[in-house]
Every structure is written in structure tokens, then in C-alpha cells.
Amino acid sequence: MNRQEREFLNAVNAAVENWDYSYEHYHEWDDFCVDITIDDMDEWAENESDIWRALSEVADEWGAGIDSDCNKYYLGIQFS
């Protein structure tokens, strides 16, 4: 993992540090991807909009793509 990827991962983790979550990061083609799962479904349901907002702010700041499916969030970024 290079410095930019580490900084992006740190920003993503900081955005969701208030919630119980797990994550994985990997490379897919030219993208660096981070998948976030909010582990507690009740916590996710109570905070869904706040979680989306926090991760969207990181995505906007870094120029990353973001998507979600229930309590899972997918972020991807391409570093040149």
C-alpha cells in the first residue's frame, strides 16, 4: 500500500470511527477499493444518513466513487 492509499484508508476509517464497523481494502484493476460494513444492524438503521454523509464527505474530498447496499459501503479511487 502506498502513501496515498494509506491516507485515503485513514480518512475512511476516521469517518466511521464512531460506529462498530469492519473493513477490507484491495486493488481491483487500477482502483484502490475500501469496503466498509457496519456490523451492528440496529446501529446502522439508527445512523444510516449520518454514516452515508460522513463517507460521502470523504469521497467528495478525495474524488472517490461511493456506493452502498444496506449496511455495506463501497469506496473506490484511482491514483495516477
Predicted regions mapped to residue ranges:
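Acidic, low-complexity, intrinsically disordered interaction modules
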Residues: 20-80
